[in-house]
UniProtKB/Swiss-Prot annotation:
This is NADH-ubiquinone oxidoreductase chain 5. One of its GO terms (biological process) is mitochondrial respiratory chain complex I assembly. It is a multi-pass membrane protein. It comes from the Eukaryota. The keyword Protein biosynthesis does not apply. It comes from Mus musculus.
Length: 607
């Protein structure tokens, strides 16, 4: 065994040790949240060793395989793939989760089931690492289903609340639709290639692979909340804030994009799939950015920003730039986790208040949290020399030099400016203007379990983009030199968005609206998607099934067959019997006339 395999196994052993301890009596004698946080911290430190060696030696990839089981002619192996994507994402995920775990010990300290909560978060991380390091479809599926199940348990953590249960069910049901696509791809690869190993699938690449690629795209659409299967993502904010931070930064929602990044050799020459990804991502990033503009729940604004960034990653994949999409996954994890943790700190301090209209002037009473919130918001918009800039600027340069589907690319640029608008809206309502919260709230942000994780992620939000961007493989952006106005597009769009948002916020504070604006209603009600998909469609289908099953059953089977058939039979028999009036002479005369007519006809026939 080499250093890479040893490191991966050691990371998994360290992460599994808290799970095993939680099943024994040892959990009663240790500080379980602290133990788990320490395990993840050491796992992160260990993951740096293979990461640095990988970059130093300019390695491409390395596969570690153990035989598992043979089914008929197909051999299943347990194989781990150590390449640029898996080894870098492992370090990023461990660093972010280390901070979230420490934050959870502060945020959930009063919860009686905090040990189980920490265990669920650890399992969430483990299943995501299984997904990223897997080298065959079966292991990918284990990690894929694992993150889905753990998200269901964590979103519905406060199971006494109806909204939390509904949100958890939404997440699992929308992901079931995506799982259908994943299973379709697995079945196709099994039948046509007789293998689930990624190497064999990539080497036997042919042009007749539209069905599995559409299956993988459906899977990514469900998991990464692309347009059409997106309503579960804002609903998932019903879970605790640490769950939202982990879910949106480095686990669940980026799993779909990571899946398409992993299979990018199959999509490179398939123009239909590339165009579909481009248009789907553009539609997602614009729609969710519009929805974020008028939301008032701070967590939902950040959730919609995640969905918008996922759409941007899908656009990048549609432009055939998988390394840029992966770079944005890694940079996005730092500031998105920090944004959620800052919002959690504010919500916790303001007695569980999430409405940004009831905040204001947090800067003076929570200077550290508000400063980090501003840094995270600026990084999200792609402000120069923060982490988000290094990925977003490259993506916008790629958009400007790309020669496919100008409408989709223009929509993406508009959505990017909207990112600056809703980020400025958060900064304006939370940190600026006058205080709008009750004066008797006690605010304390001096706990090291709160300060240290946000501090680490703040450093990551400033410096991580520079470090990661200089270690990604060269991308295939066609034009390496461009005019200054194209080069500064990202900055111009962000600054314009900030200025427009600031002006609009200042104006709306002075206006009095008599009635709701229909355009605002479209954005506030999330494009009427929840109403249509969750209310009208089920109601119509249930009414149709009710009428089909009950009305037709009642009309045909219960009326025509049993009661009405009996009554009809009795009526006919009664009619037959009541026709006999007892007129014997009349009956004999009729009989005689008939006999005479028959004899006449018979005699005519004989002649």
């Amino acid at each position: 065994m080499n250093i890479f395999t040893t490191s991966i196994l050691l990371i998994f052993i360290l992460l599994l040790s808290p799970i095993l301890i939680s099943m024994s009596n040892l959990i009663k004698h240790i500080n379980f949240p602290l133990y788990t946080t320490t395990s993840i911290k050491f796992s992160f430190i260990i993951s740096l060793l293979p990461l640095l060696m990988f970059f130093h030696n300019n390695m491409e990839y390395m596969i570690t395989t153990w035989h598992w089981v043979t089914m008929n002619s197909m051999e299943l192996k347990m194989s781990f793939k150590t390449d640029f994507f898996s080894i870098l994402f492992t370090s990023v995920a461990l660093f972010v989760t280390w901070s979230i775990m420490q934050f959870s010990s502060w945020y959930m300290h009063s919860d009686p089931n905090i040990n189980r909560f920490i265990k669920y978060l650890t399992l969430f991380l483990i299943t995501m690492l299984i997904l990223t390091s897997a080298n065959n479809m079966f292991q990918l599926f284990i990690g894929w289903e694992g993150v889905g199940i753990m998200s269901f348990l964590l979103i519905g953590w406060w199971y006494g609340r109806t909204d939390a249960n509904t949100a958890a069910l939404q997440a699992i049901l929308y992901n079931r639709i995506g799982d259908i696509g994943f299973i379709l791809a697995m079945v196709w690869f099994s039948l046509n290639m007789n293998s689930w190993e990624l190497q064999q699938i990539m080497f036997s690449n042919n042009n007749d692979n539209l069905i599995p690629l559409m299956g993988l795209l459906i899977a990514a659409t469900g998991k990464s909340a692309q347009f059409g299967l997106h309503p579960w993502l804002p609903s998932a904010m019903e879970g605790p804030t640490p769950v939202s931070a982990l879910l949106h930064s480095s686990t669940m929602v980026v799993a779909g994009i990571f899946l398409l990044v992993r299979f990018h050799p199959l999509t490179t020459n398939n123009n239909f799939i590339l165009t579909t990804m481009l248009c789907l991502g553009a539609l997602t990033t614009l729609f969710t950015a519009i929805c974020a503009l008028t939301q008032n729940d701070i967590k939902k604004i950040i959730a919609f920003s995640t969905s918008s960034q996922l759409g941007l990653m899908m656009v990048t994949l549609g432009m055939n730039q998988p390394h840029l999409a992966f770079l944005h996954i890694c940079t996005h994890a730092f500031f998105k986790a920090m944004l959620f943790m800052c919002s959690g700190s504010i919500i916790h301090s303001l007695a569980d208040e999430q409405d940004i209209r009831k905040m204001g002037n947090i800067t003076k009473i929570m200077p550290f949290t508000s400063s980090c919130l501003v840094i995270g918001s600026l990084a999200l918009t792609g402000m120069p020399f923060l982490t988000g800039f290094y990925s977003k600027d490259l993506i916008i340069e790629a958009i400007n030099t790309c020669n496919t589907n100008a409408w989709a690319l223009l929509i993406t640029l508009i959505a990017t400016s909207m990112t600056a608008m809703y980020s400025m809206r958060i900064i304006y309502f939370v940190t600026m203007t006058k205080p709008r919260f009750p004066p008797l709230i006690s605010i304390n942000e001096n706990d090291p379990d709160l300060m240290n994780p946000i501090k680490r992620l703040a450093f990551g939000s400033i410096f991580a983009g520079f470090v990661i961007s200089y270690n990604i493989p060269p991308t295939s952006i066609p034009v390496l030199t461009m005019p200054w106005f194209l080069k500064t597009t990202a900055l111009i769009i962000s600054v314009l968005g900030f200025l427009i948002a600031l002006e609009l916020n200042n104006l709306t504070m002075k206006l009095s609206m008599n009635k709701a604006n229909p355009y605002s209603s479209f954005s506030t009600l999330l494009g009427f998607f929840p109403s249509i998909i969750h209310r009208i469609t089920p109601m119509k289908s249930l009414n149709l099934s009710l009428k089909t099953s009950l009305t037709l059953l009642d009309l045909i089977w219960l009326e025509k067959t049993i009661p009405k058939s009996t009554s009809t039979l009795h009526t006919n028999m009664t009619t037959l019997t009541t026709n006999q009036k007892g007129l014997i002479k009349l009956y004999f005369m009729s009989f005689l006339i008939n006999i005479i007519l028959i004899i006449i006809l018979y005699s005519i026939n004989l002649e």
